[in-house]
Swiss-Prot record:
The RxLR-dEER motif acts to carry the protein into the host cell cytoplasm through binding to cell surface phosphatidylinositol-3-phosphate. Residues 43-76, 108-138, 389-408 are annotated as: Disordered. A motif (RxLR-dEER) lies at residues 46-66. This is Secreted RxLR effector protein 114. Residues 1-19 form the signal peptide. One of its GO terms (cellular component) is host cell. It is found in: Secreted; Host cell. The keyword Lyase does not apply.
Length: 556
């Protein structure tokens, strides 16, 4: 009887398991289309439900009674059918394939929506088929709007720097299209109206007027159609893979800048060069704006301090005025390098050019203009102009003095000296070099050179500002006791020191001695500079002091 009960219970349990399996299979087939993962969950839940240990399945029979355990041989773990597992695997594979297919479809759709370049359409201008230029407002390369922030973030800075700003501005304004490789698309037969539209669209608007083009192009130059076409042809010939706007902007800017520079400087004086003219090599003239000697501004006060007077005297003022206006460059010693026998063809091309180099534009501007605009000048007139220019090349028509030919005759007219201050060969050599180096403001006697050479060769107290130097000059002036002799000594320089016309000072011994003393003080400044500059000629000199007050010194 007990065995029959156990058999009935086993049959009921088996029937329930089969019904549950059929229900689960129908449920999986119904939900596989929505989500393949749901079938796996159902299988797992069913396996868990059927594989639970029978020891844990207790049937409640009240608080005290419990059902007896099932025999281990009756309730076994049910096996899942192979057909059920195969169906689940197929459904899972189909779900994954559907997801992959949908993702691929979305990716292809995104790729198909990217901006594509439109091929340029052909159009006809003035009877010719032309290809339209790429849109000047659309670049082949996109530029990020937030470049500044991106650069700052990458460089780990809080704010964009000026260099970043310039780089971003350049990247935004750069034209990434290749320059044209064939000739210009604008025909010469195009009408003015069409040219205006074409040129403005293709060329002018591509230029950055504020940053890449000289503003004089927009302010002064008005270009004709022919000039624009010529520029376009010039730009097309050397074209290479470089931005069009940069190439054209540089070319226009450079050409305009050169043109304006030539217009502004058409009357500027050009430094002469040494050219071979009619078999002779003329040397370039010294710069007329540069003197070999620098002149101090406070000469009267320096003279008053050195000569120990309370204030500058009239002689000191006259001497300072003349020294300031004097030209220290040597006047030309030879005749003009142009020979009258030069052929007319050479004179036609060489003389106007050489005249333009030598004419003083302040004094001979009319002559220069006539040489440019008129062709009726004769050879005699041009040679006359050249001769007049040679004479007026310097403020002093001729050199103040030259090297003496007869030293004994010159010494007899010179100032009185002490017996130890004799004129030897060394003095003659230094004196000749000093006279030939400058156009001296005052006449220099060999006796004066002998005394100054002795002073400059002192180991100490040789500076022009030294008190013993003043005493030596004053003593030499006092040796000249006769006014008639002093007047002869100062003969060439008397007007520069005592004045002229109504301002001339009385010619008396006191004024003559002061004038001679002033002359020696000024000349020693220049002689001191000359000796220290020519140490190959004057040897054994001490170290040159740096005077805080000076009258004349060399500019080199």
């Amino acid at each position: 009887m007990c065995g029959a009960h156990f058999v009935a219970i086993a049959l009921l349990v088996a029937a329930g398991c089969q019904t549950a399996a059929e229900f689960d299979q129908d449920d999986i087939q119904q939900t596989s289309k929505d989500d393949s993962m749901a079938s796996i969950d159902l299988l797992q839940s069913r396996n868990l439900r059927e594989s639970r240990d029978s020891k844990d399945d207790l049937l409640s029979a009240g608080d005290e009674e419990r059902t007896p355990p099932f025999p281990s041989g009756v309730l076994k773990e049910p096996k899942v059918a192979d057909s059920t597992m195969a169906a689940a695997n197929v459904m899972r594979t189909e779900g994954e394939a559907s997801a992959i297919k949908a993702a691929s479809k979305n990716l292809n759709q995104l790729k198909s929506n990217k901006p594509q370049r439109i091929a340029p359409a052909s159009r006809s201008v003035a009877g010719q088929v032309l290809h339209s230029s790429p849109d000047s407002d659309k670049s082949l390369v996109s530029v990020e709007n937030e470049q500044l922030l991106v650069l700052a973030k990458r460089r780990r800075t809080k704010h964009p720097t000026a260099m970043m700003t310039n780089a971003v501005r350049s990247a935004e304004q750069h034209d990434y299209r290749l320059a044209p490789t064939e000739s210009s698309t604008l025909p010469a037969q195009a009408s003015d109206g069409q040219l205006s539209k074409q040129l403005i669209t293709q060329k002018v608007l591509q230029l950055d007027k504020k940053k890449h083009v000289d503003e004089s192009l927009w302010r002064e130059e008005l270009m004709t159609v022919d000039e624009v076409l010529h520029l376009l042809e010039t730009f097309d010939k050397p074209a290479h893979p470089t931005a069009v706007n940069v190439h054209e902007a540089n070319a226009i800017g450079i050409a305009t800048k050169k043109l304006n520079y030539l217009r502004r400087n058409k009357r500027k004086r050009i430094a002469p060069t040494s050219n071979n003219v009619v078999g002779q090599v003329p040397h370039a003239q010294p710069d007329p704006d540069k003197s070999p000697v620098l002149v101090a501004k406070d000469i009267p006060s320096v003279l008053a301090k050195r000569l120990r007077t309370d204030h500058p005297t009239a002689i000191m003022e006259n001497a300072a005025r003349f020294v300031t206006q004097h030209n220290y460059r040597l006047a030309p010693t030879g005749p003009s390098t142009i020979i009258a026998a030069t052929p007319n063809s050479q004179l036609k091309y060489h003389l106007p050019g050489q005249k333009a180099l030598h004419l003083d534009k302040n004094e001979h501007a009319g002559d220069l203009k006539s040489l440019r605009n008129e062709e009726s000048h004769t050879i005699e007139h041009i040679l006359h102009l050249r001769e007049r220019n040679d004479k007026s090349a310097h403020t002093t028509a001729e050199n103040h003095q030259s090297v003496p030919e007869d030293w004994n005759t010159v010494s007899a007219k010179g100032p009185k000296l002490l017996s130890k201050d004799s004129i030897n060969e060394k003095v003659k050599k230094v004196h000749a070099a000093f006279v030939e180096a400058f156009n001296l403001p005052f006449h220099q006697y060999p006796e004066e050179t002998a005394m100054m050479l002795k002073l400059v060769q002192r180991k100490t107290k040789s500076s022009p500002n030294n008190g013993e130097t003043y005493d030596a000059f004053m003593y030499m002036a006092e040796l000249q006791q006769h006014s008639s002799h002093l007047r002869k000594l100062l003969g060439p320089d008397l007007k520069m020191l005592l004045g002229t016309d109504k301002t001339v000072l009385p010619i008396k011994l006191e004024n003559l001695q002061e004038a001679y003393n002033v002359k020696l003080v000024i000349m020693y400044d220049l002689f001191f500079e000359f000796c220290h500059d020519r140490k190959d000629l004057v040897e054994g000199l001490p170290r040159k002091p740096k005077p805080n007050q000076w009258i004349l010194k060399l500019s080199t």
